[in-house]
Curated annotation (Swiss-Prot):
It comes from Clostridium botulinum (strain Alaska E43 / Type E3). The record marks 108-109 as: Important for bifunctional activity. The gene is dcd. This is dCTP deaminase, dUMP-forming. One of its GO terms (biological process) is nucleobase-containing small molecule interconversion. The active site is at 121 (proton donor/acceptor). It catalyses: dCTP + 2 H2O = dUMP + NH4(+) + diphosphate.
Length: 173
């Protein structure tokens, strides 16, 4: 079952952490998260799962940054989130989707216990100008049934910035 906006609000600061938090961004069953002012792009057209792929940092100026179709941009939320009780999920807002802007390719599912900034896998179907601090996506929370363990992977936990793929670490086991 998905938590209502009123339930999210009740649990802020205890079972749900969103920092910074603004009550105006609560929706009926989600909370709007905003876009940080930096992006990463991969330097090479061909990527390799078994190695760290080099990235380049782009700054999103106040006047906006034009994104190109067919290119993956990695961004992040301004907000740090954490919950040890609910399953966090991330989705694009319908307003961004109607502009042909995807904010995640496959990683919209979070784990109980994840603490950090959400890395956004941004992709557009046509050129689009984006702006920093835009309400770009929404987080919502599911209850979980049964016993569970908290997320304990060191790969992305407590990140401080945009996280490129760390899949190469899976091959080091």
């Amino acid at each position: 079952m998905i938590l209502s906006g009123k339930e999210i609000l009740k649990h802020i600061g205890e079972d749900i952490i969103i920092e910074p938090f603004s009550e105006e961004r609560i929706n009926p069953n989600s909370y709007n998260l905003t876009l940080f002012n930096e992006l990463l792009v991969y330097k090479n057209d061909t990527l390799d799962m078994k190695i760290p792929n080099e990235t380049e940092k782009l700054i999103i100026p106040e006047e906006g940054l034009l994104l190109e179709p067919g290119k993956l941009y990695l961004g992040r939320t301004n907000e740090f989130t954490q919950t040890n009780k609910y399953v966090p999920m991330l989705e694009g807002r319908s307003s961004t989707g109607r502009l042909g802007l995807f904010i995640h390719v496959t990683a919209g599912f979070g784990d109980i216990g994840f603490a950090g900034y959400w890395t956004l896998e941004i992709f557009c179907v046509q050129p689009i100008r984006i702006y920093p601090n835009t309400e770009i996506c929404q987080i919502y929370y599911h209850n979980i049934d049964g016993e569970y363990d908290l997320y304990n992977s060191g790969k992305y936990q407590n990140n401080n910035g945009i996280q490129p793929s760390l899949m190469y670490k899976d091959f080091e086991k």
